[in-house]
């Protein structure tokens, strides 16, 4: 699948093995990085990773699994299926600073606000920190969950590290001493797929889940402030039993708008943040799209970008005007710049259309054994009834009387 993210002046997207970065304000050439041509893993590192428990049956495809942009836009990091962790600087020009190796395949990356560390969450439930100031230093294990981690976030003051896992849990830990847990945010009934500390609200946490809800938390205390069921917005009116996950939650830089994307539905739901009411998200617009989006992001100008899952390249740009979100003209300079940059790599995006859901295997498996139980119960009752009937029939005299049996035998004495 394709992923997009915008920070500072940069619009960055990844698909398959390739990352493409476009500067929205400066006339700079787009930056393209192909992981299949990147530095290969040393043999000794490969042996160490296999001995650490990574299955050799999983083939390395060089596909990008996650990437992150620092708050200033000066650093970008990506991790791929080959277990690389590649760090870039973007100023004065793009440059690969280092290539390091992670123990297991990663699911999420997050920079500190100070941009001195990068936190990496992996599928085994561990979080490692990697230094930005010492770009070749090995990572340090910071904390672990008992199940796969799906997202990691940091508080704006870098005090807390927030982790979400497959087993419905959100954990808030002290970054400097992660063994000290500040709080748990508990309430989802399926895996937690997305985390966001929204701009302008540093004490809030927004979380999305495979249960189809978005929750708003005061994460330092673990208190839930608000919950939104995305089914209420007509996402699944035809099949109310269908399961779906909240795949992305983003907020505009001015902190006034929140956008929620649910996997597999051709729409994006917009909310406004009601600062007068604690933790309240007020429904605003529902953007009905021609196709399901791969991903969405806000840029530094509070514009909403939507990348559609299509064999024909379709990038949409929306602006908030007169209390509504309106589609921008295709001749918009920023949109043309992004479209032209992605056009050269679109063969990679076309190959990702229709791929299997990344959340499909994360849902809890429910067994409906009531019918089997009732059938077995009825079989036991029938068997017991037959036994009782047989016992009742066997207790009655079944022998013929002497008078009916003929002459009485004579004594021989």
Curated annotation (Swiss-Prot):
Name the record gives this protein: tRNA (guanine-N(7)-)-methyltransferase non-catalytic subunit wdr4
Native source species: Danio rerio (Zebrafish)
Region feature (Disordered): 386-413
Cited PANTHER family: TRNA (GUANINE-N(7)-)-METHYLTRANSFERASE NON-CATALYTIC SUBUNIT WDR4, WD40 REPEAT PROTEIN 4
HAMAP family: TRM82
Oligomer and partners: Non-catalytic component of the METTL1-WDR4 complex, composed of mettl1 and wdr4.
Classification via Gene3D superfamilies: YVTN repeat-like/Quinoprotein amine dehydrogenase
Pathway in which this enzyme or protein is active: tRNA modification; N(7)-methylguanine-tRNA biosynthesis
Entry's family note: Belongs to the WD repeat TRM82 family.
InterPro entries given in the database record: Trm82, WD40/YVTN_repeat-like_dom_sf, WD40_repeat_dom_sf, WD40_rpt
BP-aspect Gene Ontology terms: tRNA (guanine-N7)-methylation; tRNA modification
GO cellular component: cytosol; nucleus; tRNA (m7G46) methyltransferase complex; tRNA methyltransferase complex
Pfam families for the chain: WD40
Keyword Repeat: yes
This protein's record includes keyword Glycosyltransferase: no
Gene, per the UniProt record: wdr4
Alphabetized GO MF terms: enzyme activator activity
Function: Non-catalytic component of the METTL1-WDR4 methyltransferase complex required for the formation of N(7)-methylguanine in a subset of RNA species, such as tRNAs, mRNAs and microRNAs (miRNAs). In the METTL1-WDR4 methyltransferase complex, wdr4 acts as a scaffold for tRNA-binding. Required for the formation of N(7)-methylguanine at position 46 (m7G46) in a large subset of tRNAs that contain the 5'-RAGGU-3' motif within the variable loop. M7G46 interacts with C13-G22 in the D-loop to stabilize tRNA tertiary structure and protect tRNAs from decay.
Record keywords, A-Z: Nucleus, Repeat, tRNA processing, WD repeat
Residue ranges of WD repeats: 101-140, 144-183, 187-227, 286-328
Location within or outside the cell: Nucleus
SUPFAM superfamilies xrefs: WD40 repeat-like (SSF50978)
